[in-house]
């Protein structure tokens, strides 16, 4: 259940704000029980992702993030959220892999033909992983030890296999050649805020 969706949204909400409001602290048992929305203007998105966008500018007014429940009990709300979204972020705990609600969310997205990106969360829980708050995942992957990267690769390829069983081709975001054929996976640490700009940059790319 706790794959880090609300922690990720905390970081999204805190973009451009010095003091982070913690949605996680306010929710009973850490479970999201309603659909909430957070709008992030283009100015903040462009500042956050300037290095990764390589001079490109996101022209839209901004992105509206809609928070849908991850708990298995809230299937109807999740279905509603999945069917009205232009793009979805599917969050998976990389240390645990797919859960029943992950599969259900994939089914909803497939049926509604909603493009989605996978956030492989909790990389900071991989043994030996060196997390740095706010760092891009592009830099983080270069700075990890061989042992940490070996464990990361094991968990990543297990995830690839689980998605393949349900007919989805997934690929690490920096290795995707064709976003119409492969679904991008962005490793992140929602707790540390690591890889958030990489994730947002991929969402911007899909939105354009």
Question: How should these model regions be labeled?
Answer:
Residues 16-29, 42-53, 74-76, 99, ...:
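Active-site phosphate-binding and catalytic loops of NTP-dependent enzymes
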Residues 2, 15, 45, 70-72, ...:
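Conserved nucleotide-binding/hydrolysis micro-motifs of P-loop NTPases
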Residues 2, 34-35, 58-62, 83-86, ...:
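Short loop/turn elements that form and flank the Walker-type P-loop nucleotide-binding site
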Residues 16-28, 63-66, 75, 88-97, ...:
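Flexible beta-alpha connector loops of hexameric P-loop NTPases
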């Amino acid at each position: 259940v706790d794959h880090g969706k609300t922690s990720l949204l905390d970081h999204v909400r805190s973009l451009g704000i010095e003091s982070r409001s913690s949605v996680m602290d306010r929710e009973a048992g850490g479970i999201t029980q309603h659909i909430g929305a957070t709008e992030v203007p283009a100015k903040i998105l462009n500042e956050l992702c300037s290095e990764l966008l390589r001079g490109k500018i996101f022209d839209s007014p901004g992105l509206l993030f809609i928070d849908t429940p991850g708990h298995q009990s809230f299937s109807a709300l999740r279905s509603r959220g999945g069917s009205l979204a232009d793009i979805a972020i599917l969050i998976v705990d990389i240390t645990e892999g797919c859960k029943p609600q992950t599969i259900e969310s994939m089914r909803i997205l497939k049926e509604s033909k909603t493009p989605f990106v996978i956030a492989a969360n909790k990389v900071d829980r991989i043994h030996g992983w060196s997390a740095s708050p706010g760092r891009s995942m592009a830099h983080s992957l270069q700075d990890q030890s061989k042992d940490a990267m070996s464990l990361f690769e094991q968990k990543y390829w297990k995830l690839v296999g689980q998605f393949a069983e349900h007919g989805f081709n997934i690929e690490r975001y920096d290795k995707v050649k064709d976003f119409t054929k492969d679904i991008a996976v962005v490793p992140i640490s929602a707790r540390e805020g690591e890889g958030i700009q990489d994730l947002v940059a991929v969402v911007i790319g899909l939105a354009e």
